[in-house]
């Protein structure tokens, strides 16, 4: 368990990597790894709720994943539908908001409708937010925000010289949630793969060799304890963070 809740992260983001390697290691077809990964999400969501995490954002399908073999993409879309169906009763029971970010235009009308229904049914919950990134890319997110700001300028609602970081950020995904405190990537790779590029500006980064289907609450707790022990300066000196004067 987490040793202290004094400086708990409010927002954790996870790149859920390693499903295919898990399948190969266990003699399973590719789909078996993705199914195991889907099933692994449930206990971690409940654990995050139990320890007081305010928001959990998971990278389920990137904008680049459309380049994968067609049969794998079709399987992933089916599993995403199943994930929404599986998560919704749990979200309603625990009063967790279920949300989705990403380019919905690339998704089927059926999947979009399922996602919208789940969001509407859980929109009023404030205990915790589970955000699933589908057909998402950080660069897409930033370009989309640029378009929204450009429209405001074109309409005369905002001048180019007056644009602030806050003006821009409010058009990004997750603008109403705390900035990401912890970014975790499972599966052994050391990159963030175009995930929440703006929102992770000051996130503490954690990488693990553990494949996503084998990533458990105990390892998450170890990472959170390390996070709590880190000094987050946000550009300041250690003395400023500690409130010391000389």
Across the structure, where does each feature detected by a protein language model lie?
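Flexible, compositionally biased loop and terminal segments
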Residues: 1-246
């Amino acid at each position: 368990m987490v040793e202290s809740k004094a400086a708990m992260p409010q927002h954790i983001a996870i790149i859920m990597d390693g499903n295919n390697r898990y399948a190969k290691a266990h003699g399973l077809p590719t789909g078996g790894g993705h199914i195991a990964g889907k099933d692994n999400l449930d206990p971690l969501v409940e654990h995050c709720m139990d320890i007081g995490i305010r928001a959990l954002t998971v990278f389920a399908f990137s904008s680049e994943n459309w380049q994968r073999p067609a049969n794998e993409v079709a399987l992933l879309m089916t599993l995403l539908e199943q994930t929404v169906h599986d998560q919704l009763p749990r979200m309603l029971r625990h009063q967790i908001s279920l949300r989705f970010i990403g380019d919905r235009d690339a998704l089927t009308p059926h999947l979009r409708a399922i996602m919208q229904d789940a969001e509407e049914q859980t929109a009023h919950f404030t205990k915790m937010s589970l955000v699933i990134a589908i057909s998402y890319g950080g660069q897409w997110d930033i370009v989309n925000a640029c378009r929204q700001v450009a429209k405001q300028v074109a309409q005369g609602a905002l001048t180019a010289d007056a644009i602030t970081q806050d003006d821009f950020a409010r058009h990004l995904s997750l603008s109403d949630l705390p900035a990401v405190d912890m970014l975790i990537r499972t599966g052994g790779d050391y990159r963030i793969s175009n995930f929440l590029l703006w929102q992770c500006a000051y996130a503490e980064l954690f990488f693990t060799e553990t494949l996503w289907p084998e990533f458990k609450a105990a390892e998450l707790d170890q990472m959170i304890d390390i996070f709590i022990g880190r000094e987050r300066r946000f550009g300041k000196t250690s003395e400023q963070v500690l409130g010391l004067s000389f």
